[in-house]
Swiss-Prot record:
<dbReference type="InterPro" id="IPR000589">
    <property type="entry name" value="Ribosomal_uS15"/>
</dbReference>
<keyword id="KW-0934">Plastid</keyword>
<keyword id="KW-0150">Chloroplast</keyword>
<dbReference type="Pfam" id="PF00312">
    <property type="entry name" value="Ribosomal_S15"/>
</dbReference>
<comment type="similarity">
    <text>Belongs to the universal ribosomal protein uS15 family.</text>
</comment>
<protein>
    <recommendedName>
        <fullName>Small ribosomal subunit protein uS15c</fullName>
    </recommendedName>
</protein>
<dbReference type="InterPro" id="IPR009068">
    <property type="entry name" value="uS15_NS1_RNA-bd_sf"/>
</dbReference>
<dbReference type="GO" id="GO:0009507">
    <property type="term" value="C:chloroplast"/>
</dbReference>
<dbReference type="GO" id="GO:1990904">
    <property type="term" value="C:ribonucleoprotein complex"/>
</dbReference>
<dbReference type="InterPro" id="IPR005290">
    <property type="entry name" value="Ribosomal_uS15_bac-type"/>
</dbReference>
<keyword id="KW-0687">Ribonucleoprotein</keyword>
<dbReference type="GO" id="GO:0005840">
    <property type="term" value="C:ribosome"/>
</dbReference>
<keyword id="KW-0689">Ribosomal protein</keyword>
<dbReference type="GO" id="GO:0006412">
    <property type="term" value="P:translation"/>
</dbReference>
<comment type="subunit">
    <text>Part of the 30S ribosomal subunit.</text>
</comment>
<dbReference type="GO" id="GO:0003735">
    <property type="term" value="F:structural constituent of ribosome"/>
</dbReference>
């Protein structure tokens, strides 16, 4: 992981972020994964923050739906993405 501008950025996503790249399924899953990890670390400190917990569950659902779509459309890109993001497959 590299730090760039105070944010952690994975090496495979350092490519120039063009407008078309931001709409790709891979970029959206990457973005949701970063938000999920940030919220999970927040909830470790603030266990009774139920509104953030609800937001985390919504993000998990959105990411799960996007991953299901990608797995159905292009299995190779799906496998590559989950290995790079270090998330498990269901």
């Amino acid at each position: 992981m590299k730090k760039k501008g105070g944010r952690k950025i994975f090496g495979f996503m350092v490519k120039e972020e063009k407008e078309e790249n931001r709409g790709s399924v891979e970029f959206q899953v990457f973005s949701f994964t970063n938000k999920i990890r940030r919220l999970a670390s927040h909830l470790e400190l603030h266990k009774k923050d139920f509104s953030s917990e609800r937001g985390l569950r919504r993000l998990l659902g959105k990411r799960q739906r996007l991953l299901a779509y990608l797995a159905k459309k292009n299995r190779v890109r799906y496998k590559k993405l989950i290995s790079q993001l270090d998330i498990r497959e269901k």
